[in-house]
Amino acid sequence: MPILKMSELDLAGKRVLIREDLNVPLKNGEITDDTRIRASLPSIQQAMQAGAKVMVMSHLGRPTEGEFDAAFSLAPVAGYLSHLLGQEVRLAPDWLEGMAVEKGQLVLCENVRFNRGEKKNDEALAKKMAALCDIYVMDAFGSAHRAQASTHGVAKYAPVACAGPLLAGELEALGKALENPARPLVAIVGGSKVSTKLTVLESLSQVVDQLIVGGGIANTFIAAADYNVGKSLYEADLVGTAKQLRTAAQEGGGDIPLPVDVVCGQEFSENAEAVLKRIGKVTDEDMIFDIGPETSKHFAEILKGAGTIVWNGPVGVFEFDQFGEGTKALALAIAESPAFSIAGGGDTLAAVAKYGVGDQVSYISTGGGAFLEFLEGKQLPAVAILEERASQ
């Protein structure tokens, strides 16, 4: 269903309330990764340049709802935005009571989670937010899977509700990757547990041509193929499920390829010695931490021949260099592949940054949970309400 886009509206002189995802990591009050702030900049600048009175709201961390806590204040973000925009960005602590904003100016609303009722999508709170604006812009893809007052409720009651450029771009890229993909469609799903990504694996295994699994997830599939995984992280209770998923994928003409060689260690540490082994030679004392070079080469060939690639999660413990070669090889293969590629999820973005392939991945998603729920085929509440408003 279509949604209204901010780019289609005349914003001049209008009070525009934008929900961004500025939930950035902080250390001693300093921002350690500004990716989300930079991703939101084009939307904010577009509204300011159009002569709108711009108000931006976001959450930060997980404070006790309804209570101010300086550790979760957006003050560092306001300072950072001032620096990037080259003009003062005021932080408004009691913004729900209304605030004066000039045309072309930006005010940052203090952490939405300091308001009681935010997470529960409280109607009275949502109406207060809606009363602040002429146009509400949902631009926080990273929070689109949450039905909260600042992502969902406000869109119900604002005079006009639309999608910002970042959200619109995410939906377009994900649609291109999953709704009408160029084939073969290859997905990489890494991570420690099958249980947390089971619905993603089930959903993707039915639509992709090849599903490459990595990390602890791969260990469960290796165990399902009756190989010893030693002391590796895996889920014994989901071995049967992994077997069924692989069989179903193969019956549908696809596959979940398994490693032929792996890199093992005896302890989880950056000093652990990396030992290369054939998959059938893993001992009871071993822990599998990465895929081996032969497997990397095989998976890289699959990626280079793909039409579309969806990447969510590393295939090894890449934060330790000796167990990062597999993830590095796949990152470089994705970069070299002519396929349309989309990467999402925190660990994935860290791998993209570590191996310097950001410019060669077609689209980098800012969403973690929202990215996964989209992959599961779930309706995102914040998008659903925009569709509903557009059809009224």
Curated annotation (Swiss-Prot):
Chain positions recorded as substrate binding sites: D21, L22, N23, R36, H59, L60, G61, R62, R113, R146
GO cellular component, one term: cytosol
Pathway assignment: Carbohydrate degradation; glycolysis; pyruvate from D-glyceraldehyde 3-phosphate: step 2/5
GO biological process annotation, one example: gluconeogenesis
Sorted UniProt keywords: ATP-binding, Cytoplasm, Glycolysis, Kinase, Nucleotide-binding, Transferase
Catalytic activity: (2R)-3-phosphoglycerate + ATP = (2R)-3-phospho-glyceroyl phosphate + ADP
InterPro entries assigned: Phosphoglycerate_kinase, Phosphoglycerate_kinase_CS, Phosphoglycerate_kinase_N, Phosphoglycerate_kinase_sf
EC primary class: transferase
Subcellular location as annotated: Cytoplasm
Pfam families: PGK (PF00162)
The keyword ATP-binding is assigned to this record: yes
MF terms (GO), sorted A to Z: ADP binding; ATP binding; phosphoglycerate kinase activity
The protein's assembly and partners: Monomer.
Family that this chain belongs to: Belongs to the phosphoglycerate kinase family.
Protein name, entry field: Phosphoglycerate kinase
Gene designation: pgk
